[in-house]
């Protein structure tokens, strides 16, 4: 079969609330990939198959997901975002498009990713933010939380924070930045940048961090849990709704 002429990359933002993650699902379950591929097929005049930088879970959001696909469609790349967005629901938006090199892969060419996790400290539930933050109803010790996050910076074995029964891959990753920011009105954002992340890694780190902030786990105990490389010692995974894929790094791709 003849290779398709163009490799097109897209940057995509989406609200993951109503989708069963990014990765294509079988009807009646709908994922972001299902919706995006259907719209692209209409614009390109042929079926396309997306490769994505990250397979976000159900309820997880993205500001800067990156995908690529091969096509013989002739639409100018500058017109592609507007054409596709006209066919997409309002909770999925193509923000950029560019012609990529044939060997570019949104997944395999990535050199790093940035995630942000959002927390809101509330006295009562907030119905307007419940799908976009982890709502916490007790005071949090921000200094203690920052102290344990600092332990995670560097190249480490993150087995304690991987998904239970996760795929057999190396648990060693490098996190070169973890930053907890107070945004006012009881809102916190935690930015994490690294060369890669294990499945559920960010959400499990957030779960343990919040347990420290609530005084349920001491800073010393957090360090012991991290060193133990045992997922069973970490509290249940934090909610998906607070997690956002912020951006993906590439060596030679415009950002």
Question: Could you describe each region identified by the protein language model?
Answer:
Residues 1-255:
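Structured-RNA-binding interfaces characteristic of tRNA pseudouridine synthases
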């Amino acid at each position: 079969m003849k290779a398709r002429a163009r490799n097109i990359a897209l940057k995509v933002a989406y609200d993951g609330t109503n989708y069963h993650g990014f990765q294509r699902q079988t009807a009646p379950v709908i994922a972001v990939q299902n919706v995006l591929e259907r719209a692209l097929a209409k614009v390109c005049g042929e079926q396309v198959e997306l490769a994505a930088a990250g397979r976000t879970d159900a309820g997880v959001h993205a500001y800067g997901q990156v995908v690529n696909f091969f096509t013989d469609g002739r639409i100018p790349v500058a017109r592609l975002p507007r054409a596709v967005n006209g066919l997409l629901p309002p909770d999925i938006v193509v923000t950029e498009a560019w012609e990529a090199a044939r060997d570019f892969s949104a997944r395999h060419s990535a050199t790093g990713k940035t995630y942000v996790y959002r927390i809101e400290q509330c006295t009562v539930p907030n119905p307007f933010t419940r799908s976009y933050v982890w709502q916490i109803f007790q005071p949090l010790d921000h200094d203690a939380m920052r102290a344990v996050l600092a332990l995670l910076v560097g190249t480490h074995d993150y087995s304690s924070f991987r998904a239970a029964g996760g795929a057999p891959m190396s648990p060693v990753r490098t996190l070169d930045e973890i930053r907890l920011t107070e945004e006012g009105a009881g809102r916190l954002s935690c930015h994490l940048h690294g060369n890669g992340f294990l499945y559920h890694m960010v959400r499990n780190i957030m779960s343990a961090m919040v347990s420290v902030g609530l005084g349920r786990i001491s800073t010393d105990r957090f360090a012991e849990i991290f060193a133990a490389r045992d997922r069973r010692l970490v509290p249940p995974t934090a909610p998906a709704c607070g997690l956002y894929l912020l951006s993906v790094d590439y060596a030679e791709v415009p950002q």
